[in-house]
Amino acid sequence: MFEMKNSTRYILSLLLSIIMGVAVMGSTFAISTTYGTGHTTATVDNLKPVVNCSSYEMVIRTVQGIKVYEYKNTTGVTPGLLRSDALEAYAYTGEGVTFYVNVSDPNGEQDLQTNGAGVDFLLVPQGQSPSNPTYVIHAGFDTSTSGDADLTTLTFYAQWTVPAGAYGCFDVYVKATDKHGACTGYIKKGKIFLNPMIGINVTKDNDAYPAPFTGLSFGNVNPGDTNVPATENVVTIHNIDPDGVGTKIAVFVSATSMTQAGGTGIIPAENIKAHVIKANNMTQSYNTHLQNNVKVLLWQPLKPCHTNALEVNFTLDVPTPLPSGCYGGSITFYGLGL
């Protein structure tokens, strides 16, 4: 009995020693630690800027600042403006053209802002190499697009005035360069026609077939006669649009008073009345009196195409008293591009 108790005590003592040993060993391993250090590296490549393929816009304004044309890559030509239905965007000397485009840089928009970086719009004669542009238009960036939610993209724009002497159809290219000299190359974005030619053709339609207009004849008249029709009625003015870009025009007429040959009699130009009866393929009813040596507006805008021709009748009120004899003056028609 005593031996069994001693054996039991020995076993318990041994177990306690093992447990304590484990505890001590565990404590010893916990405070015995080691570690290693090193460096992480990466090289970020400088990537070329990217011209957003759907961001190009162009706005044309007259000398007076009136917006007459707008194109957006995303929506096309803005309707309802004077030149919205032109076959090609066109602008005249002194008018303002504003170009817009979004450019991105994967390395961050700051690469597009510092010295040496930039965006240019290039006007190149249609079909020719962009490496030899006629006009280089440097763009600035819209500061409101810097530091916004998109930290890689800026909107660039350039305001340009059409110079005197510029003529023809030009392709519009964009070239973007970052501060390291990496560039997009030449990206074609659109076209514009500068200073398209204006042309009118005036005919008289009193014959079986239209004939070239050579003047107005009111025949034999008496003092006091009113609304005497010209034998050339109907006079037709055609917008022939020589460059085929869809130019619209304003049509003016100027006349001189008719004076008596070898005498002092005069029939004022103001006594001649123009009756507009058709324009842009629609019936019209509009009257205006001519003025001596003054360009009087007959109609605007007149669209191109034979069916859109302006048709006008002319009548004369003969003053009284008026000496007998032959009277003569002149009449001229003008077209002004719109």
Swiss-Prot record:
Record membrane topology: Multi-pass membrane protein
Q: What are the entry keywords?
A: Cell membrane, Membrane, Transmembrane, Transmembrane helix
**Which domain of life, per UniProt?**
Archaea
| Location in or out of the cell | Cell membrane
A single GO CC term for this protein reads: plasma membrane
Task: Give TM regions.
Answer: 11-31, 249-269, 318-338
> What protein is this chain from?
Uncharacterized protein MJ0289
Its source organism is: Methanocaldococcus jannaschii (strain ATCC 43067 / DSM 2661 / JAL-1 / JCM 10045 / NBRC 100440)
